[in-house]
Amino acid sequence: MAEPTTMATTLVELLGHRVAAEPDAPYFHVYDETVTYGALWRESARYAAGLRRAGIDQGDKVCLVYPTCKEFFFTFLGLLRMGAVPVPIYPTLGVEATANVFRDSEAKAVATIGWFRKGVEESQAGASNLRHVLEPQDLEVDDAAPAFPAVTEDDVAFIQYTSGSTGLPRGVVLSHANVTRTVAFMAEAAQLTRDDVVVSWLPLYHDMGLIGCAFTPPSIGAPLWLLPPDLKNPRVWLELVTKVRATFTVSPDFGYRNCVRNIGDTSGIELSSLKQALSGAEPVRLSTIQAFEEKFSAENLITPCYGLAEATLAVAIWPRKTPLRLDSSGRFLSVGPPCRGVSVKITTEAGEAPAGTEGEISVRSPGVMQGYYRNPAATREVLGADGWLRTGDLGFLDREGFLFITGRVKDLIILAGENLVPADVEEIVDHIPGVRYSAAVGIESERTGSQRLHVVAEVREGAEDAERLSHLVREIVQRVHRGRGHRPARVLLVTPGTIPKTSSGKIQRSRLGAMITGDELGERIVYASGGHRD
């Protein structure tokens, strides 16, 4: 048995240890191809030579605009070994937003594939600092591998641009120590061993997919099976879990919800091998967990977790195969105790809050970021000199130190002095037949200055009958009023895909509010609580 690499201080060392111990062992499987640790090491050296030929040197930033593919790993590790800095980007972020990341990161080059080249070049026009657009054929050279500098734990490993749920993405600077220490305590909290088999469809440009699924398995020698994140049919995910006898997988809540809604025939799906299915990156719903476990005959399978990019992902993970814990109101699930080495406190305007009191969650851990790249003002807003990170999330700790997430500070809707959590409204609306997905936002009235509740609901394709849509609007208003005591001031029924989301599936509520007030929804509205849009 190869030794674990959890004591590695850099990602280069972590993977290098695995290469030395078992070069022929599979690191990951993707698109019916297996990449071993030895192959990764050889190809990353080759890609490093291609990057050096293009003028990339130690400290340079290179944006990675890739789908889930082996070339992503070859480029990423090649850059790490050179002492250069990878900057993974959401491939379909949009021309202006991508150009903003190109400029903000001071990237010297972009590594991509032909599928995305046109969009990359459109964004390149808005970033004069960008000198090269490189594809695999530009990097797969026969030059001798360059001399690799010594990489230390304090060096920048990569820059992870945040999802941007409340504004433009910011570059989270993570050191090698941030990543390797987080990977170590994540593997421990999730009780992962080399006997586990991991399946992931999460994107590699997001922290949950990259750090949680791509870097954690090699720390303990577990094989990884990858799927593309744009799965049209969720059955493909569960069929792969069944086929390879996976023991561990992870998804935001909407992924499990998608399986419940869109997999009719469950024959051929057998999840008994799964020891744990983590749920995170968005509010975890007990109703989703119960529906999934009932439909697929699983018990104590889905476990909540909590983290954020600014903390190198992991903060708390619920123990596997342990009954879930609800708060006394029955509304909120615990995401577990903080991981080893992670401290959590709850603060209000009065200071640190006692057990059971809701406030803003702050975190201190070896994973807390170095700061936002080239943005000291934004860094000071969230990161204190004492190392405490303000997360912007709301929650509380119970008397045993278990963490509960209740919402997000900036998302709270204040109606007649009462705080309303958007996720509470969305859970009610999402269970109404005919609704595909929903979002609740508070929009300030120009006349009174007070917030008014707006509900936007995506309706299933083919739902175009005005009478049925009118009935659906009334049903939404009645159920929200019955469940939360407030009537929506306006309900907008829209076409599928209208509600803006981040790369990890979080609702961009501030963006949605701007779309409503700026009258940007236009023809995507199929019915509104003021009348029908033809």
Located regions from the model:
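Structural core segment of the AMP-binding/adenylate-forming
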Residues: R53-A54, R81-P149, P252-D253, N258, ...
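Conserved ANL (AMP-binding/adenylate-forming) active-site segment centered on the GW(Y/F)…HTG consensus within
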Residues: D327-F332, V368-G392, V409-K410, E426
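Gly/Ser/Thr-rich phosphate-binding loop
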Residues: L238, A246-S251, V260-G330, S343, ...
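Conserved AMP-binding/adenylation subdomain of ANL enzymes
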Residues: T180-V197, D207-T247, N262-T266
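Conserved AMP-binding/adenylate-forming core of the ANL superfamily
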Residues: T5-M7, D24-L77, G94-A99, A150, ...
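AMP-binding/adenylate-forming catalytic core of the ANL superfamily
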Residues: V110, T249, S365, Q370-G371, ...
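Conserved C-terminal "lid"/linker of ANL adenylate-forming enzymes
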Residues: I413, A439-E444, H454-V455, V477-R533
